[in-house]
Amino acid sequence: VLPYFKKSENQQRGASAYHGVDGELSVTDLISPAFVSQRFVDACVELGYDRNPDFNGVRQLGAGLYQSTIKDGKRHSTAAAFLLPIRQRSNLTITTGALVTRLLFKKTRVVGVEYLHSGMLHQVRVNQEVILSAGAYDSPQLLMLSGIGNAKYLQKLGISVVTDLPGVGQNLQDHVNVSVVRQTTQEINPAITSNGSEAGLFFNSEGNPKAAPDGQFFFGPGIYVPSGFNGPNQGFTGVVSLTRFQNIGSVSLRSSDPKDTPIIRMNYLQSEADVQKLVAGIRLMRKLFQSKAFNDFASKEIVPGPGVETDAALEAYI
């Protein structure tokens, strides 16, 4: 898929083996990263991790500043990049506020879609192809509503089976995140152009430099805590995230009615191994925040908190 990524990208740094400059989506360096974000990168290097100036390049392991999809000082979304510039084309119709109810078939080939709009059912048929891009929840829901999925399960709901494909909806994955938040006596006011998470670290928990990362840290200026938190407003936040994990969730149908929301089971933290990786990640984040790079911040931990030290206490926090 790399050629398609390059084709879609307008990389501020210029063209390379992994980046393109002729695409629609603007990708840039941070306009004004907070000085504390660079300190996070320095802390990672201090603990033995490599600097990585390009997470979307030849390798992902290491620490560095993230890039952003920004254009003219504003977020450059996929809609702004790909859709809005061509919305006047005569061969393009954009319909909003519509609910796709099922795919239309000719034998086992998808030839169109049926959708509900303003209380009326409509059908659109195509000569070429239908691209199903409805997200992690609605894509499997739509496939199953259309008869693609576990045949026995669909038949129980009264749905005619087109293709028996038991794996549909059975591979739901989501990153589990936990935060370490520290207060500081210094002002760390992020620029209004900040994307919140400015720096990061990709690492392999087993220390294998050739293996794919199974953990990721996000770091940014500012205190990110649940709403209703009453405390200091100067600080920084590190987020521990699992990029590979054992527990897989599922999406299943509540009924054969497209208007019924699907049943979503995330299965978060059902694996002890995943929980222990998060515990280890919190300990590593704390070690980074206690490194020389952060010495002059006179900071104290807000979350999980100085009294949360044992594995059991950290597991309870998670």
Q: How would you label these PLM feature ranges?
A:
Residues 35, 39, 81, 137-141, ...:
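Generic recognition of stable, solvent-exposed alpha-helical segments in well-folded globular domains
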Residues 103-192, 255-256:
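Glycine-rich loop(s) and the adjacent beta-strand/alpha-helix scaffold that form part
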